[in-house]
Structures are given as C-alpha cells and as structure tokens.
Amino acid sequence: MRHVISILLENEAGALSRVVGLFSQRGYNIDCLTVAPTDDPTLSRCTILTTGEKDEAEQITKQLHKLVCVFRVSALLEEAEGGLERELVLVKLYTPNRSIRDEVKSLADIFHARIIDLNAEIFTLEFVGSSAESDNFIETLGKIVEIQEVVRSGLVGIAKGSHFMKP
C-alpha cells in the first residue's frame, strides 16, 4: 500500500539525516523524497512516499514524532479523501520530423503540458500532475515518440481545505 508522509522539521544540518536514518533503521524503503524550506526559514517541509502495510506506516509515523528535530507529521490522504499531490516532470523528446512534432504538440495540449525548449530535432516538455498522471503522460509519450530523457522532481503534497501544517 502507498503512503505519503508529510513532515515539518528543523531546517538545519543533520535533521533530514535523522529522518532518513529512522526509515533505514526500521528497514523501510523510501520511494520518493522531496525537501525544501517553508515560508519560515527555520523549517523545512519533507514529503516522503513509501510503500508498506498500514500498521507499518502508522509505526513509522509514531517514531518520527519522537525525533527532536520533527515538529509535525501528517499522513496525506489520496486526493479523493482530502489530500493533494503533485510532481513536476521534464521530458526531452526526439522529434525528427514535422509529423511527430505536431503529434507531440497535440499530446502536450491534451495533457496541459508546456513546451519549454525546442530545436530542429528535440522538444522538452514540462508537465505537472499527480504521480499516476505523470506515469500516464510518460507512457503515452513513449508510444508515439522516442524519449531521450526524463527528470521527475519528486512528490509534494498538501491537505485540502482548512487543514494546516504548522509547528
């Protein structure tokens, strides 16, 4: 089962290492990790995607609460249940002729992707969506054009509505 855990922690050396170390000590794999400072420069927001049983996710959440460097921990729900998640995808495509370029432009419009760089044979597209939407976008592109390179930012998430994550 897929679990997205959002953590508010100190923005200082070693804090992220302690969080990651906890996962490692318990034998939990991190599928995706995204960290950045918040509007408060003393805090960072860390989003971790992991897979495992529900009780394992609850256990790791309880252990994270015990770390001194951690202020808040929240398990983000699926979008239908009250969570929002997004990731940025950059895809470099080989587009050797006009027919393929036109097809890529049409697909970019359908997926609300943007062409951010192009030359005679290469298009670079930018796409923002959920992990599932990103997977679908990449898979669909791969069926019509040769993908040269894919870069994914990693997952970020936030609760819907009036739920806030503050220390």
Show which residues each predicted segment covers:
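A conserved regulatory-domain signal marking ACT and ACT-like small-molecule sensing domains
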Residues: 1-167
